[in-house]
């Protein structure tokens, strides 16, 4: 079956100290009948640069995709929840202007394009895809678990 789960609320990530905080608002998980799923939300935050990190600009709220999944039903039970890997590994992305190119290899991957595009404005886009950095093995999303109970 198909399903939609919506959460109300906001969480903030101070990814690079206080220089480029961002926040995720009202995430929504949509699962189709075949088990493919997408986690979307609104993102907002502040942008900065390495050249002048003390100057921050407030970025407009933007709808984005946080994660995509191939088959969530393979990792659990429809009636109670699941844990599934994201589509990070092997995903292609077009880096925002001024960002390093995406590289291949065993750790090639990317967070969803809209998420990377938003972070082109924060100055941290290359943190969210394989860019050839030593940290590339650490950029992949961890498996996501969603657990619930169904009330008829």
Where are these regions (language model features)?
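Primarily mature extracellular domains of secreted and cell-surface proteins
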Residues: 1-152
């Amino acid at each position: 079956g198909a399903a939609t789960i919506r959460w109300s609320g906001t969480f903030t990530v101070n990814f690079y100290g206080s220089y480029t905080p961002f926040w995720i608002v009202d995430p929504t998980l949509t699962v189709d009948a075949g088990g493919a799923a997408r986690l979307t939300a609104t993102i907002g935050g502040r942008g900065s640069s390495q050249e002048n990190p003390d100057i921050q600009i407030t970025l407009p709220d933007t709808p984005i995709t946080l994660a995509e999944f191939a088959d969530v039903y393979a990792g659990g039970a429809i009636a109670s929840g699941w844990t599934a890997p994201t589509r990070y590994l092997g995903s292609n992305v077009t880096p925002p202007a001024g960002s390093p190119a995406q590289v291949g290899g065993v750790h090639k991957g990317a967070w969803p394009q809209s998420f990377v595009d938003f972070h082109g404005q924060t100055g941290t886009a290359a943190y969210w895809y394989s860019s050839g950095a030593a940290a590339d093995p650490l950029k992949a999303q961890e498996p996501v678990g969603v657990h619930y109970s169904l009330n008829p």
